[in-house]
């Protein structure tokens, strides 16, 4: 079984082909990703119109490259999977229209995948883990703690009430004059910084509900930066290290709370899974590895190339859905907003 996956929800254009092995695990046969960082760097963030146009220019070539790399033709495919949202509507439409056209011409099943669900299922592609598991989904636009009970069965235990973790990293980087994208730049600067120089707040620590709030932390860093301006390179490094340490402390505390809540709604987890672009942060991975070990669980995080947006995760999510007969109609809509997990009932936990 081979599925083509198409990803165009933000600033990566991607096409991949994933197959199912005999043991049920996924095999990435091709994974083509073209980043638009250079196109957006001058603006300090993603410009939706530029992103959509860039997808149009390269998507067909990436699909052709994926097929060429595998030696497959369209007749060899069992399905066409595409990220139908959430994301920037212009980009989502580019991928969705392309996928619908291919599905019509080749008469292959269309699999309209939720981009967030694809992140949630990536650990099954790379490690073959079973359900249920606790997912920390942390990216530029989303921060959620989710009980993943099965394909299509997702219960949100906690979320951010303001900024997503990746968004906070990007805003701090911009405030400190670092390059775009901000997350890797903050992590790089933090390597030579003193994480104890600035006593930044740890919002929501100890709260029963495992939600996040990062706007206050971001404001506190801005006030410290203004207080000591003009900033030296060491000041920037120390601010980044202090900010990253605060984020890690908050995440560990919130995940610990989610682990407590998990048992009441989904039983014993098979693993703690970290997914999304922020899961590439080394300090966060180390802290989560320690936390998972204390809980007697493995930490499962995708290889770094699969933390960010990619076509392989879309293809795999499509393949998981295809095996369950969850095929979409050709009229499937583009969905710029598309929650993928139900909220935890107030009576649970």
Curated annotation (Swiss-Prot):
Keywords, alphabetical: Acyltransferase, Cytoplasm, Iron, Metal-binding, Transferase, tRNA processing
GO process terms (BP): tRNA threonylcarbamoyladenosine modification
Residues noted as binding Fe cation in the record, renumbered to the chain: 115, 119, 309
Annotated substrate binding sites: 137-141, 170, 183, 281
A GO CC term attached to the entry: cytoplasm
InterPro entries xrefs: ATPase_NBD, Gcp-like_dom, KAE1/TsaD, TsaD
SUPFAM superfamilies found in the cross-reference section: Actin-like ATPase domain (SSF53067)
Superkingdom of this protein's organism: Bacteria
Function: Required for the formation of a threonylcarbamoyl group on adenosine at position 37 (t(6)A37) in tRNAs that read codons beginning with adenine. Is involved in the transfer of the threonylcarbamoyl moiety of threonylcarbamoyl-AMP (TC-AMP) to the N6 group of A37, together with TsaE and TsaB. TsaD likely plays a direct catalytic role in this reaction.
Protein's recorded name: tRNA N6-adenosine threonylcarbamoyltransferase
Organism: Methylobacterium nodulans (strain LMG 21967 / CNCM I-2342 / ORS 2060)
